[in-house]
Amino acid sequence: MSKEGVSFKNRDRFIQLGIAISTLRKLRGMSQDQLAEKANMSRSHLSAIEAPNMIRSFSLETLFNLADALMITPSDLLNTSL
């Protein structure tokens, strides 16, 4: 595992999820600051999740908060293919 706790096997999944979050945020006309505030997290943490070159694992609570803030179900967020 890497220092962020993401195994190589899951690396691409976290990259895809970060890209999906970023794309949905932009489609909704939200800045990182706005989404981070609605999802109860720091902008720097959100930025790290969205960045494809910084693989960052995160909790289910964070996933649920992001999904709620993006007005999408967690399962739809996980199944988003953008």
Report the location of each language-model feature:
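The alpha-helix within a helix-turn-helix
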Residues: 25, 36, 67
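Conserved hydrophobic/aromatic packing and binding residues within compact polymer-binding modules
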Residues: 21, 35-36, 46-49, 77
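Short, basic-rich loop-to-helix N-cap that marks the start of a DNA-contacting helix
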Residues: 53-68
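Residues within the helices of the helix-turn-helix
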Residues: 22, 33, 64
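A short, Lys/Arg-rich alpha-helix, primarily the initiator
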Residues: 2-27
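Recognition helix of helix-turn-helix/homeodomain-like DNA-binding domains
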Residues: 40-56
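Short C-terminal boundary/hinge segments that cap the last helix of small helical domains
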Residues: 71-82
